[in-house]
Amino acid sequence: MTVSRLARNTLIAAFALSCASAFATATDELRDFVRTVKSGKSTFTQTVTAPAGKQKVSNGSFEFSRPNRFRFVYEKPYAQTVVGDGTKVWIYDPDLNQASSRKVGDALANTPAALIVSNDIDKVFTLADQPSKDGLDWVLATPKQAEGTVRSLKVGFRNHALAQLEIDDSFGQKSLIVFNAFESNAKLPADTFVFVPPKGADVAEQ
């Protein structure tokens, strides 16, 4: 094995700069991502397009740790925090000082977050390879249970790093989440996925 080939394989093992051709299919790449990437963080831009064509753009940050722990922080245009602590999923709106929670199993079922933070995606989704587009390897994920609002998801990888999510929902909306400089197996503080409602907040728990 040449020095350059050895160096490339070392990078693949470290999940820094991997080569997409190391995977037979895009679904293999997704399954490898689930198996080997135990945590991650990134900033993101989310664009939601309504059936009539009107778009809403928001920005924020995202962190996760398997299984079922994650934090979405929306910063613009409206602040909102969504935290999954492994048991519950909390949604907090600081402008209204309102917090609500649901059991993680109910909140994550068939959602985009489940595709990223779950350990067994084949149990929840039917996976199918899609043509490469825009330099990304794409997988179509269709929920096996016809529940919730998500009809289908597409996840795109660039060099084994999570790059984009495309979401089609039952309201006819299309959402695109673009992850910027995704960091695999990031070391995250222990309190990243802890949420305590602020004093005086209106709290509703299910």
Which residues does each predicted region cover?
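N-terminal leader/targeting segments and the immediate start of mature chains
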Residues: 2-3, 13, 17, 21-56, ...
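Extracytoplasmic
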Residues: 37-39, 57-59, 65-67, 77, ...
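Beta-strand residues in well-ordered beta-sheet regions across diverse protein folds
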Residues: 43, 73, 83, 92, ...
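Short beta-strands and strand-coil junctions in structured, solvent-facing domains, enriched
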Residues: 50-51, 78-80, 98, 146-150
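An acidic-aromatic
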Residues: 61-110, 175-176
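Gly/Pro-enriched, hydrophobic low-complexity segments
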Residues: 100, 123-206
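Short, solvent-exposed helix-to-loop capping segments enriched in aromatics
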Residues: 108-122
